[in-house]
Every structure is written in C-alpha cells, then in structure tokens.
Swiss-Prot record:
Residues making up the signal peptide according to the UniProt record: 1-22
Gene3D superfamilies: Tetratricopeptide repeat domain
Domain of life: Bacteria
Name listed for the protein in its UniProt record: Exopolysaccharide production negative regulator
UniProt keyword Signal, yes or no: yes
Gene: exoR
Pfam families per the UniProt record, alphabetical: Sel1
GO biological process: polysaccharide biosynthetic process
Keywords: Exopolysaccharide synthesis, Signal
Amino acid sequence: MRAGELKSLRVAVLGMSLAVGATAAGPARAFDPGAGVTKESGPFALFKFGFSAYKSGRKDEAVEAYRYAAEKGHTGSRWALANMYAYGDGVAENDLEAFKIYSEIAQQGVEPGSEDTGYFVNALISLAGYYRRGIPDTPVRSDLSQARQLYFQAASTFGVAEAQFQLARMLLSGEGGSVNVQQAKKWLNRARKNGHAGAMGVFGNVIFQEGQTARGLAYMTAALGQCSPKDRPWLQAMQEQAFSLATEDDRRVAITMSQNMHLQNDDD
C-alpha cells in the first residue's frame, strides 16, 4: 500500500475508533493450571494455545488466550478475536466489538512482506463491509464512499479477489460514487482470474446485457458449475433468467463455450 493511502486509511479508521471507544476487555480468569500457559506467557505462546483450544472446542479458553495475546500486540490474536465477535463464535455476537478490533489492526498498518499482511487485508475487507451497511444502534453509520475506498485498497494493492468483486459491484450500482461499468468489468475480470466464481457470473451478466448473449450466458453457466454452495442460489437465479431470454441457438453455443471456461484461466 502506498504511504499516502495508508496514512489516509489510518486517519479515517482512527477517527471512528476514537468515536466508538477502546476495545472492551472481557472478564479475566485464570487458565487451568495444566494448560501450560499463563496470562504472563508470550503473545505467540498464547496465540498457539488459543488456536489449539479453539480447534478442540474449548472456545472460552481460546477467547481468553486471544485477549491476553491481543493486549500484548499480537495481530493474529486480534484478528481471531474480532472474527469470533463478528460471527458470534464462542462469544455473544457483537459487531461493534469486532469493528473496534478490526479498526485497531488497520490502524496499526503492515510492513511490506510482513506475516501479518493477511490479517491486515482481512481487517480492511471486514471494515469495508461494516462501513457499507453500518451497525444499527451504534455510532458506526453507513459510509459508502469509505467502503469503496477500503475495497479499492485491498483490491489494488493486495489483489484480493473478494475485494475486487465487491468493488466491482459498487461500481456497477453507483454505491459510494459514480457508476463505471468499464472499471467494474476490469475488476470482475481480475477477480475471476483470481478464482472468484461470483465475479465470473456477474461479468457474464454484464456482457449479456451489453449484447454478447452467448458469451455472457456461457460465463454465467460456467460460474454456476464452479461456485461454492453459498453462491449457488443467486448465481442460479441470474443464469436461469438469462437462459430464458436467450435464443435456442445462443443457448447451445453458450453450453459448448462454458465447458472450456475455467476460473483463473485467461480465456476472455
């Protein structure tokens, strides 16, 4: 990330972080004497213990270990704790608490090549989602311009497919700025080549509407065959609508073309 962009991001996130207050610490309690770690242990030891406890289903111990490690500045523990709050995983779901911790990670920044880069980028994307929709009954209001900026930074600097996809969707709908179909197509193509089936489907829908009926339907059909279960319902609805509008000839051509279309292939 360029220095100017990172400084701007830190300022924006710091402002919201100050507005909502510091991360709340949960009630402290001692680890089991046989755990092999204490709250005085090093941050990485606490993180490893927390990860092991989480995988074993002892999520209360994982939260405790992550909290202590986070207080010692361990980015991975902050990220894990934020995710647990965001999804209500082992703790009561608390989007505001998750937002605060993601903000701390983004505010801290990351050095080029750092092992913390993945946590940092995940925090950017999570913050973008919160800014996009806001958090009801909290000081965190929807800020579509900020959401678009965060997606752009994650998409352009780090090449993350999900950020590229979400940025493209905002460009198509005009969320947080003007509509720009050409830029949206560029980002959809990049996300598709980075393995994002949803981006492949939406790209196909865009060019279908532009008049490239067979090719657009082919992309949607290929995406439907390669997507994750959670994306299947909306991709299927989109593909079926396009299929119903296409001619019989275009349908046959699209089915044939789709068999040679694969994620991450440069087949456009």
